[in-house]
Amino acid sequence: MAKRLLPAHPGLFLQELMTEYGLTQYALAKAIGVQPIRIGQIVARKRAITPNTALRLARYFGTDAQSWLNWQAHYDLQVAQQTLESKIKRDVHPMKEAA
C-alpha cells in the first residue's frame, strides 16, 4: 500500500506569512502576546492552532479566526483519516436501514 502524503499543517501557511512580512518567530510571538516557543512549535507542525492562537493571529494579520481553525480542523481530520480509517472500517459497522 502506497503511503499517502500528509496534508499541509496550518503552521506551513503561518511560516509563509511570516516570510512574506519578514517576521521572525520571536517578533510574531511578541506582537501577539505569546511565548516564542508556541510559534516555533506551530511552524514545526508540533502544535495545533487553538482558538486562543487563532484569535490572536486573526487580529494581527487582519484575517479571521475561523479560517485558522478551519485549516487546523481540516489537517486534523485528514491525519485521522489516514491513521484510523482501516481500524474504524474494521471496528464500526454502518447502521442498518429500518425495514
Question: Which residues fall in each region the model found?
Answer:
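A short, Lys/Arg-rich alpha-helix, primarily the initiator
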Residues: M1-L23, N70
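The alpha-helix within a helix-turn-helix
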Residues: M18, A29, A58
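Short alpha-helical DNA-recognition segment
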Residues: L23-Q41
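Residue-level detection of the helix-turn-helix DNA-binding "recognition helix"
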Residues: G33, A44-K46, A73
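Short, basic-rich loop-to-helix N-cap that marks the start of a DNA-contacting helix
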Residues: K46-R59
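Short, charged recognition helix plus adjacent turn
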Residues: L69-A99
